Amino acid sequence: QWRRSLDLQTPPQHTLLSCFGGLHLPLTTPAAEVGHGQWTLLCFGNSFPKTAAIKPLQPPWQPQQLMPLCSRVLTKPGFSTICEALGHGCGVILVERQGFAEAAALQSGVQRHGFHRLISPNQLQVGDWHLSDPLLPPHQGPLDRTGAQTASHHLAQVLMAGVN
């Protein structure tokens, strides 16, 4: 239903979500595959040129609502977005970031546990996103995507044991 309301013409495996949170990067050049209509880019804000393959989004849309519609998420190293993307089974195209305390740990975690591709800020700006290339596989395998449910179940058991 959401695919219809957004008028998405490409299948999920050719739909990309761009999430940069508060970084507000002035992106003007999408990947060639987006420009040629092979991929659809869902993005927040209006920094990209308006084309049929670029869907600018406004609130109330949230990134986690859109991830099930996509195969890949283009993002900076940010804990919440990476967790949501991996939790939804999305591959991550991660823009390398210097000067951010958690960046190295998040980049390493994505490489260990998610299908991924690291790109430089320059590659981001010139549209060199490697969308036609398969993502690199995780070095150690994916994380358990039911971790939140497992933790909630365990917490409920502990609390119930305390009541009895």
Question: Which sequence ranges carry the predicted segments?
Answer:
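Short Gly/Pro-enriched loop/turn and capping motifs at secondary-structure junctions
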Residues: 23-25, 48-49, 80-81, 99-101, ...
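Nucleotide-sugar donor-binding patch of glycosyltransferase catalytic domains
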Residues: 56, 91-130, 134-135
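Donor-nucleotide binding loops and adjacent catalytic segments primarily
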Residues: 1-72
